[in-house]
UniProtKB/Swiss-Prot annotation:
It comes from Homo sapiens. The gene is LARP4. The modification Phosphoserine is found at residues 392, 505, 583, 597, 647, 722. This is La-related protein 4. Residues 415-437, 574-600 have a biased composition (Polar residues). Residues 381-394 have a biased composition (Low complexity). Residues 13-22 are annotated as: Interaction with PABPC1. RNA binding protein that binds to the poly-A tract of mRNA molecules. Associates with the 40S ribosomal subunit and with polysomes. Plays a role in the regulation of mRNA translation. Plays a role in the regulation of cell morphology and cytoskeletal organization. The keyword Acetylation applies. Residues 203-281 form the RRM domain.
Length: 724
């Protein structure tokens, strides 16, 4: 046996007592059988049987026992000791077991030592405190366990730590709860709730200066129960408290039926309910938030966000964004939760941030989406020739005009037409911004609105460049129908177009003749009858020079093209006469002011501006009349009328007519390609541009029938010619 102890000591000092080595050795020795049930009992047994052995072995066993006690809990020790009792017959093992039972017995003796009445009294005080007004205003756990009728399960109350320290008997707890006037137990004895006493009678419209004895004197009667207290509350209200609800109801009936008046006034009385724990007439306002309050100490901002859908229809304080928000655990959700969905003051404060953000976003985006169709819808919607031609001619610098249309200094050289376009642009932009400012407050709606607007802009702008590009290569044929008003009859229209083909070829030939002989035309005489005709021709060029210098360069190119063709047709009509000296250029200046307005009106005819005398109408009248003179116009050379072309060119090009003289043989096709590639502006000579216009006019229908003098809207300002 001694050897066994030494082996155990050598192996067990540094090992776990639960190691398999102990269990393997135990079956081989009958004395060590209790080891399987509890090592501590075996050590006690060894210590008892080894009384004659050296003290070192006993000390070793005690050390091992101490180490074992540290490693195991008391509950595990108790279970092991109880199993050891069953198999061991030695009485010394019962020491620890007796100790554990003594601890239990001591607790029982302490309960029995305290009288039952004292226990009930302590339990009653604890339960009444749990259901008191002060505790329920802070105890979120009890509030969370209440149902819609403020009932709490009794087993919930019995499991509270304060109650468990006193007793665990549910019958005793139920008995104490039924005896307490502060709570009310249901019929089954399963639930309990705070008792709402209605034992206070409120007397209204009684001044505070009224002596309290007079108020109490109202209830001094045999038919009225005894008054417990009488006090002034506020606003001329007096509170008279009675013992129970029955007494309060009896006193209320007594005042209404017997007393009726006090100080010459009818008595105004009502019964007030005493809320023993909360000032808000019950808990029904907190039902929606009871399950989120326990989390409030950990995440205080999670509860109000969760409660927003519940209180959304009843947000009484949504207008006041300055109301301070309390995030304390104090459960007053009636005031706290309606304010909780508005931690962001900018949303409540007049919806300023969504509106200003929308306006700024629209202002930043007004460059690209709106510039695309700012100029093009002008001539697309119009039926006039000026804007239609502008759409076809100005494609070369369409990108430049598209992105710089809001650049006012860049367009200061063309105020006539660009001013109108800019005005239309600003009006449309302003109306769009007003709709955006007032139309939407929500972010989702704003996004949908912006997407819908951009889709509409894309539908407007995408098809349009394709149509304009399709017009660009063939402007002579696509623009035939839009340049002229409908004529009364088609019979007079068809011969005009046939004469156009016969005559424009001669016009082109005449152009090259006048370019070759340009040096010799200044001193040639012109007949007296032709003086006014030349003056009118100069007036045409002079009048078109002033507005066209102020327009867009594309418009100026188109307008000068038309006027020079008309000038050449007038020159050919004037060649039938004998030559006399040309009238001085000063004769054209008095009529310049009078002829400028019809030209401007013709320019703005397509943009729905009121016109007085468009040239198209006069052409329709001319086409309906039969030719008066024979078609022997181009027999004579055109050099006599070179001054009519040179002088207006000087006015247009600011004294640079030499450009048209130096480049007389430049091909019209090359000039047309330059015209499309962006070389339109003040750099292009007007004389060279005239060749392009006359080349284009071969396919146009503005030519005058043979032998017929050009008659347009400006003839009303031209003095009549002398008879032949």
């Amino acid at each position: 046996m001694l050897l066994f102890v030494e082996q155990v000591a050598s192996k067990g000092t540094g090992l776990n007592p639960n190691a398999k080595v102990w269990q393997e050795i135990a079956p081989g020795n009958t004395d060590a059988t209790p080891v399987t049930h509890g090592t501590e009992s075996s050590w006690h047994e060894i210590a008892a049987t080894s009384g004659a052995h050296p003290e070192g072995n006993a000390e070793l066993s005690e050390d091992i026992c101490k180490e074992y006690e540290v490693m195991y809990s008391s509950s595990c020790e108790t279970t092991r000791n109880t199993t050891g009792i069953e198999e061991s017959t030695d009485g010394m093992i019962l020491g620890p077991e007796d100790l554990s039972y003594q601890i239990y017995d001591v607790s029982g003796e302490s309960n029995s030592a305290v009288s039952t009445e004292d226990l009930k009294e302590c339990l009653k005080k604890q339960l009444e405190f749990c259901f008191s007004r002060e505790n329920l205003s802070k105890d979120l756990y009890l509030i969370s366990q209440m149902d819609s009728d403020q009932f709490i399960p009794i087993w919930t109350v019995a499991n509270m730590e304060e109650i468990k320290k006193l007793t665990t008997d549910p019958d005793l707890i139920l008995e104490v709860l039924r005896s307490s006037p502060m709570v009310q137990v249901d019929e089954k004895g399963e639930k309990v709730r705070p008792s709402h006493k209605r034992c206070i009678v409120i007397l209204r419209e009684i001044p505070e200066t009224t002596p309290i004895e007079e108020v109490k004197g109202l209830f001094k009667s045999e038919n009225c129960p005894k008054v417990i207290s009488c006090e002034f509350a506020h606003n001329s209200n007096w509170y008279i408290t009675f013992q129970s609800d029955t007494d309060a109801q009896q006193a209320f009936k007594y005042l209404r039926e017997e007393v009726k008046t006090f100080q010459g006034k009818p008595i105004m009385a009502r019964i007030k309910a005493i809320n023993t724990f909360f000032a808000k007439n019950g808990y029904r306002l907190m039902d929606s938030s009871i399950y989120s309050h326990p989390i409030q100490t950990q995440a205080q901002y999670a509860s109000p966000v969760f409660m927003q859908p519940v209180y959304n229809p009843h947000q009484q304080y949504s207008v006041y964004s300055i109301v301070p928000q309390s995030w304390s655990p104090n459960p007053t959700p009636y005031f706290e939760t309606p304010l909780a969905p508005f931690p962001n003051g900018s949303f409540v404060n007049g919806f300023n941030s969504p509106g200003s953000y929308k306006t700024n976003a629209a202002a930043m985006n007004m460059g690209r989406p709106f510039q695309k169709n700012r100029v093009k819808p002008q001539f697309r919607s119009s039926g006039g020739s000026e804007h239609s031609t502008e759409g076809s001619v100005s494609l070369g610098d369409g990108q430049l005009n598209r992105y710089s249309s809001r650049n006012f200094p860049a367009e200061r050289h063309n105020p006539t037409v660009t001013g109108h376009q800019e005005q239309t642009y600003l009006q449309k932009e302003t109306s769009t911004l007003q709709v955006e400012q007032n139309g939407d407050y929500g972010r989702g709606r704003r996004t949908l609105f912006r997407g819908r607007r951009r889709r509409e802009d894309d539908r407007i702008s995408r098809p349009h460049p394709s149509t304009a590009e399709s017009k660009a290569p063939t402007p002579k044929f696509d623009l035939l129908a839009s340049n002229f008003p409908p004529l009364p009859g088609s019979s007079s229209r068809m011969p005009g177009e046939l004469v156009l083909e016969n005559r424009m070829s001669d016009v082109v030939k005449g152009v090259y003749k006048e370019k070759d002989n340009e040096e010799l035309t200044i001193s040639c005489p012109v007949p007296a009858d032709e003086q006014t005709e030349c003056t009118s021709a100069q007036q045409l060029n002079m009048s078109t020079s002033s507005p066209c210098a102020a327009e867009l360069t594309a418009l100026s190119t188109t307008q000068q093209e038309k006027d020079l063709i008309e000038d050449s047709s007038v020159q050919k009509d004037g060649l039938n006469q004998t030559t006399i000296p040309v009238s001085p250029p000063s004769t054209t200046k008095p009529s310049r002011a009078s002829t400028a307005s019809p030209c401007n009106n013709n320019i703005n005819a397509a943009t729905a501006v009121a016109l007085q005398e468009p040239r198209k109408l006069s052409y329709a009248e001319v086409c309906q009349k039969p030719p008066k003179e024979p078609s022997s116009v181009l027999v004579q050379p055109l050099r006599e009328l070179r001054s009519n072309v040179v002088s207006p060119t000087k006015n247009e090009d600011n004294g640079a007519p030499e450009n048209s003289v130096e480049k007389p043989h430049e091909k019209p096709e090359a000039r047309a390609s330059k015209d499309y590639s962006g070389f339109r502006g003040n750099i292009i000579p007007r004389g060279a541009a005239g060749k392009i216009r006359e080349q284009r006019r071969q396919f146009s229908h503005r030519a005058i029938p043979q032998g017929v003098t050009r008659r347009n809207g400006k003839e009303q300002y031209v003095p009549p010619r002398s008879p032949k």
